Every structure is written in C-alpha cells, then in structure tokens.
C-alpha cells in the first residue's frame, strides 16, 4: 500500500536492555530478516524501515542501544528522543530480567510522563533448556509496568515483528487505545497460560486416565473372562445337568420297573413305557395267584382221592 510522503508518519523506537540479551539480533531480524549469531557489543546503531501496519504506512527509526554499564551516560539522550521502547531481557539470564525495572524507572524519570509506550520482551525463547526466567515472571513484570508482554526468538523469528508492531500501535494511538489493546494482549497471555495449564493438566489426566483405562481394561478383561467362564461354566453345568437327567431318567425307568414288580406301579410320575411294564408286572402278579390256586386245587383233589380210597 502506498501513501503520500506527507501522510507517512515516522516513529522513533528505542531498544533497551542489558548487554547480550539480543537487542541487535532482534533489530536486524526485523529489519533484514537475518539472524546475527555472533555477539558484537553495540555502542549505538540506527536503522530505518518502512512498514505497513493496519493498512497504514509507517517509517520506523529504530535505535539499537548499548547495554553495557559504561555507556549508561548515553541513555538519557536517546530516552529523551524515543517515542516507544522495547524493554528486552533474556529468558536465559535472571540478572538481565532483574535490571529491566531500573531501565523503565530511568525512562519514566527522563520522560516525566504518566504514560510511556513500552513493550516487555523476553528474548531467546529458543534456548528453553537454559531458561532462568519463567513466562509467568515476565508476565507479572509487564502487568506491573502496565505494558504488553511477548517472548521472542530472534534466531527462529518468533514474535519479532509482533513486538515492534505492538509498540508502533501504542505510539500511534498515543495510548488512547492502549487499555483495550493491553486487555487483548493480556487475554492472549491468559489464553496461553490457560493452554499451558490445560496442557499440563491434560498430561496428568492422561497419565491418570491411562492407569484408569488400564485398570478398567484389566477389570473388563477379568469380567469378560469371568463372564466367559460363567458361560462356559453354565454350559458345562447345563450339559452335566442334561446328562444327569438322562441318567436319572434311565435309572428311574429301571427303578420304576423294579417298583412295578413290587406292586408300586401306580406311581403318577411313571413313564408310558414304565406303565406298560407295570401292567405286565400286575398281569404276572395276577397269574401267579391263579397258578397257585390251581396247584392247591390239584393238591386238595389228590388228597381227597386218597381219603376216598
């Protein structure tokens, strides 16, 4: 997007922080999209870049300052001319974080203003294994200064443009929209905090749920085995019961036949076959008395003959 030169606003931005925190690396990454790996202590470097922020063309005049204590006398000069400040510390250096408040207090004293456009930047995010300053510590300091907060990596170009753009918006709006934007950035930070907390909680729950699921799996597996065993057991029981009933039925048939022989064939639970056997038994029993009666008759007749003769 092009604009008339007369309508293009120029912003004086000052990058402030201790030595070795990566101020030059951030600035060069923003200006040239290039990462400077070597550390070369800066006395004072100035850069210019034209950018489009929110459809508005702007020219940034960026002053990269010295962080060494021996150049502290030069600070008040560029603090007077600066419109917005990036307060940079390294997440790998607790000392650089602790001294950041003194930089802000010096800016306040020199500017003699209630509101100073400032963005707190925690650089070297890529060196997570060397971290000495937590994200929460940086966020608390930013809230104390009533300033937005970002963690950046000049090496990996993380949040570099966002840091400068956020500062330009503060300067451009003369702080008029600062509170709403700060709330927006705070919400973003809170969302990140929530995501980090949720992630940690999710990990713990995942571990706990893993054990729970494992326990349930084992329990379900045991229940499944028990159910299966129960089914098998019931099947075997049913089979054994059927076999037992079959044997009992045969035994009962034999027993009923035996009982019929003894005159107990009138039992109500006897089978049809057993009933026939019982009838045959009763017929046999009826025949036996008749046979005995004929024998007795013959015996009596025989005896009678003897008496007659």
Swiss-Prot record:
Entry membrane topology? Lipid-anchor
Q: Where in the cell is it found?
A: Cell membrane
Enumerate composition-biased segments (Polar residues). 179-188, 209-235, 257-296
| Binding-site residues for GTP, renumbered to this chain | 20-25, 36-42, 66-67, 123-126, 153-155
Gene Ontology molecular functions: G protein activity; GDP binding; GTP binding; GTPase activity
> SUPFAM superfamilies annotated for this entry?
P-loop containing nucleoside triphosphate hydrolases (SSF52540)
Means of activity regulation: Alternates between an inactive form bound to GDP and an active form bound to GTP. Activated by guanine nucleotide-exchange factor (GEF) CDC25 and inactivated by GTPase-activating proteins (GAPs) IRA1 and IRA2.
Question: Which residue windows does the record flag with biased composition (Basic and acidic residues)?
Answer: 236-245
Q: Which InterPro entries match?
A: P-loop_NTPase (IPR027417), Small_GTP-bd (IPR005225), Small_GTPase (IPR001806), Small_GTPase_Ras-type (IPR020849)
Name positions with the PTM Cysteine methyl ester. Answer: 306
List all Low complexity biased stretches: 246-256
Q: What class of enzyme is it?
A: hydrolase
Q: Where is the lipid attached (S-palmitoyl cysteine)?
A: 305
Q: What else is known?
A: Present with 2050 molecules/cell in log phase SD medium.
Q: Which NCBIfam families does the record associate with it?
A: small_GTP
The entry assigns this protein to a family as follows:
Belongs to the small GTPase superfamily. Ras family.
Name of this chain's protein: Ras-like protein 1
- Native organism: Saccharomyces cerevisiae (strain ATCC 204508 / S288c)
């Amino acid at each position: 997007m092009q604009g008339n030169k007369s309508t293009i606003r120029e912003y004086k931005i000052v990058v402030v922080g201790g030595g070795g925190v990566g101020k030059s690396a951030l600035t060069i990454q923003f200006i040239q999209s290039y990462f400077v790996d070597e550390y070369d202590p800066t006395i004072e470097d100035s850069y210019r870049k034209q950018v489009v922020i929110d459809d508005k063309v702007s020219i940034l005049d960026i002053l990269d300052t010295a962080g060494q204590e021996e150049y502290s006398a030069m600070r008040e000069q560029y603090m007077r001319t600066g419109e917005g400040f990036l307060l940079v510390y390294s997440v790998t250096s607790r000392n650089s974080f602790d001294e950041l408040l003194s930089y802000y207090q010096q800016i306040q004293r020199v500017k003699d203003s209630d509101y100073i456009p400032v963005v707190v930047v925690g650089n070297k995010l890529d060196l997570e294994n060397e971290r000495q300053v937590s994200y929460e510590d940086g966020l608390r300091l930013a809230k104390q200064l009533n300033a937005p907060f970002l963690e950046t990596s000049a090496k990996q170009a993380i949040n570099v443009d966002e840091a400068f753009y956020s500062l330009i918006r503060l300067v451009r709006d003369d702080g008029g929209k600062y509170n709403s934007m700060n709330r927006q950035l705070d919400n973003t930070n809170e969302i990140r905090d929530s995501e980090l907390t949720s992630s940690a909680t999710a990990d713990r729950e995942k571990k706990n749920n893993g054990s729970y699921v494992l326990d349930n799996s084992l329990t379900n597996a045991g229940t499944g085995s028990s159910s299966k065993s129960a089914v098998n057991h019931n099947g075997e029981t049913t089979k054994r019961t059927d076999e037992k009933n079959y044997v009992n039925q045969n035994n009962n048939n034999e027993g009923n036949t035996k009982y019929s022989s003894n005159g107990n064939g009138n039992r109500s639970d006897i089978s049809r076959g057993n009933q026939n056997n019982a009838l045959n038994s009763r017929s046999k029993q009826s025949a036996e008395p008749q046979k005995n009666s004929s024998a007795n008759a013959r015996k009596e007749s025989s005896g009678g003959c003897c008496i007659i003769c």
